Swiss-Prot record:
The lineage of its organism: Bacteria, Pseudomonadati, Pseudomonadota, Gammaproteobacteria, Enterobacterales. This is sn-glycerol-3-phosphate transport system permease protein UgpE. InterPro entries: MetI-like, MetI-like_sf. It comes from Yersinia enterocolitica serotype O:8 / biotype 1B (strain NCTC 13174 / 8081). PANTHER family: ABC TRANSPORTER PERMEASE PROTEIN MG189-RELATED-RELATED (PTHR43744), SN-GLYCEROL-3-PHOSPHATE TRANSPORT SYSTEM PERMEASE PROTEIN UGPE (PTHR43744:SF8). CDD domains: TM_PBP2. Part of the ABC transporter complex UgpBAEC involved in sn-glycerol-3-phosphate (G3P) import. Probably responsible for the translocation of the substrate across the membrane. GO terms for cellular component: plasma membrane.
Length: 281
C-alpha cells in the first residue's frame, strides 16, 4: 500500500513538472525574443539564449510604441491599469451592495429582481455587446475611461456569489446588531464587510485579471490611439501590411503586460486561496 502511494506521488509530481514546463517554456521563448535585436529574432532556428537588448527594447516601446502604432506602450499600460482597477472596484461595490439589499432588505419582488440579474448570464456577450456600444455612443462616452469601464461594472456572477455568502451568515448577527441599535449600513460596514474579506480578495484577483485581459471591448469602444489598452495594443503591433513585424518589441510588450496581473496574484495569493476555499464551504 505504501509503495503504491509512493508511486502515485512520483507520478503526480512528474506530471506537475511536465505541466509547469509546458506553461513556462513559451514564456521563456518570449523573454528570449524580447532580449534580441531585429536581426537575431528572425534567425532560424532562433537562439534560446537571452540577448543583451531587453532594456533597449522595453525603453523603445515604453516611449515610442511599435511600428505604425504611435501611442507609447507605457500609456497603454496606464490605460489598462485604470480600466482594470475601475472595473474591479466598481464590480465589487455594485455586486456586494446589490446582494446585501437582496438578502437583508424586505421589499416586493426582490427574488424576481435577483433572478432577472442572474438570467443575464444566459445571454452571450455577442448579443449584449452591440446594444451596449450603441448606448455608450448615444451618451458620448466613446474614447473615454467612463466608456471603457462603466458597462463592465455590473456582474451577475459576483452578485450571485455575494448573495450565497451572505445567506450563510447566521441571523443572530443581524439580531444582535439591531439590539445594539445599528442601522443597515452600520451592520454592513462593521459586521458583513469584515467577514467578507477573503471573498473580496478572491473576487478582486479574478475581476482585476478579467478587466486587464479585455480585448474586444476596448477595440470597439476606442478609436483614439491614446486610449488604447495593452492587450489590444499588442495585437495592433503585429503588422498586417506585409511589412515584417518587430517580434522582439512585441514580445517585450507582452512581458510588460504580464507583470501587473502576476503581481496582483502573488501579492494576494494567500487571501485569494482562502477566499476560494471559504466560498466552497
Amino acid at each position: 500500500m505504501i509503495e503504491n502511494r509512493r508511486g502515485l506521488d512520483i507520478f503526480c509530481h512528474v506530471m506537475l513538472i511536465i505541466g509547469v514546463l509546458l506553461i513556462l517554456f513559451p514564456l521563456y521563448v518570449a523573454f528570449v525574443a524580447a532580449s534580441l535585436d531585429d536581426t537575431q529574432v528572425f534567425q532560424v532556428p532562433m537562439t534560446l539564449i537571452p540577448g543583451p537588448h531587453l532594456w533597449q527594447n522595453i525603453s523603445h516601446i515604453w516611449h515610442a510604441g511599435v511600428g505604425n502604432n504611435s501611442a507609447p506602450f507605457g500609456l497603454m499600460l496606464f490605460n489598462s491599469f485604470v480600466m482594470a482597477f475601475a472595473i474591479t472596484v466598481g464590480k465589487i461595490t455594485v455586486s456586494m451592495l446589490s446582494a446585501y439589499a437582496i438578502v437583508y432588505f424586505r421589499f416586493p419582488l426582490r427574488n424576481l429582481f435577483f433572478w432577472l440579474i442572474f438570467l443575464t448570464l444566459m445571454l452571450p456577450v455577442e448579443v449584449r455587446i452591440f446594444p451596449t456600444i450603441q448606448v455608450i455612443a448615444n451618451l458620448n462616452m466613446l474614447d473615454s475611461y467612463t466608456g471603457l469601464t462603466l458597462p463592465l461594472m455590473a456582474s451577475a456572477t459576483a452578485t450571485f456569489l455575494f448573495r450565497q455568502f451572505f445567506m450563510t451568515l447566521p441571523d443572530e448577527l443581524l439580531e444582535a446588531a439591531r439590539i445594539d441599535g445599528a442601522g443597515a449600513m452600520r451592520f454592513f460596514w462593521d459586521i458583513v464587510l469584515p467577514l467578507s474579506k477573503t471573498n473580496l480578495a478572491a473576487l478582486f484577483v479574478i475581476t482585476f485579471i478579467y478587466g486587464w485581459n479585455q480585448y474586444l471591448w476596448p477595440i470597439l469602444i476606442t478609436s483614439d490611439a491614446s486610449m488604447g489598452t495593452a492587450v489590444a495594443g499588442i495585437r495592433s503591433m503585429i503588422s498586417s501590411s506585409g511589412a515584417p513585424t518587430q517580434w522582439n518589441q512585441v514580445m517585450a510588450a507582452m512581458i510588460l503586460t504580464l507583470i501587473p496581473p502576476v503581481a496582483v496574484v502573488l501579492l494576494m495569493q494567500r487571501w485569494f486561496v482562502r477566499g476560494l476555499v471559504d466560498s466552497e464551504k
